[in-house]
Amino acid sequence: MDKTNSLSSCLSSPRCSVLANISGTDLYRDRKDYLHIFEPRGVKIFRIPSPIFFANIEFFKEKLQEAVGFNPLRVLRKRNKALRKIKKLLQENDNHSRDTGLRGLFSKTTDESCVNKEEMDQPTDLEGLPFRMNWNAELPSNISVPRVDLHSLILDFSAVSFLDISALKGLKAGLKEFIRIDVDVYIVSCDVYILEKLHMCMFFDDEIRTSMFFPTLHDAMLHVLEKHKEDKTKGWVISDTKM
């Protein structure tokens, strides 16, 4: 393999890593490389050490899904499918559903042959439900919605020096998949050039906002810990692996 092909291969298939905190410091390193390294429950820090462009954006998204342990789009579609069924049953028998709750609703079946895939990819609409929906609670046996224990995803962009239009579109779609299943997404250490490009290309909207960007990884982590104070009592995950 010549140098050009070798460089292309490295850029298109970079070594992505999951970071965690070295105890007692504001340093974050690959959790595979240390014996005693900590990460809060419900938080994942993902780093990609290269520019992002058309040739590696899908690789990046696949590695991110491997890191978090689930496909956010699949989760979103499952939730929307369940909500569609709930709302249809509420319309058919409102009083019965209020008396018997969620399990009573799912004792019936509905025709799902007319499911529109585009609708399934949209944000879940919980308005109008007579109960508070908790997707991580025990659900009826005839409904399968993957459990998501992740509440915060931090993306380390310190090595992302370039982002082309194709990658920008793919990144935006991928981030929305997480946001729509109630995972807070943060981007840290982003190059000023990249931020300017995001503004120019209309990257930001009602779902993806500038407030998700933090100057450093530790700043983002402090924000997450403050936002989820109640989770501190649940402790930290300790990694005992070493390369």
Residue ranges and their predicted role:
Residues 73-79, 209-211, 234-236:
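Flexible, disordered linker segments and immediate boundary regions flanking tandem C2H2 zinc-finger modules
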Residues 206-224:
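Short acidic-hydrophobic, aromatic-tinged amphipathic segments that line or gate anion-handling sites
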Residues 1-201:
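The feature marks cytosolic C-terminal regulatory regions of anion transporters and related permeases
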Residues 228-243:
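C-terminal helix/juxtamembrane-tail motif
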Residues 68, 224-228:
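Short, hydrophobic alpha-helical segments
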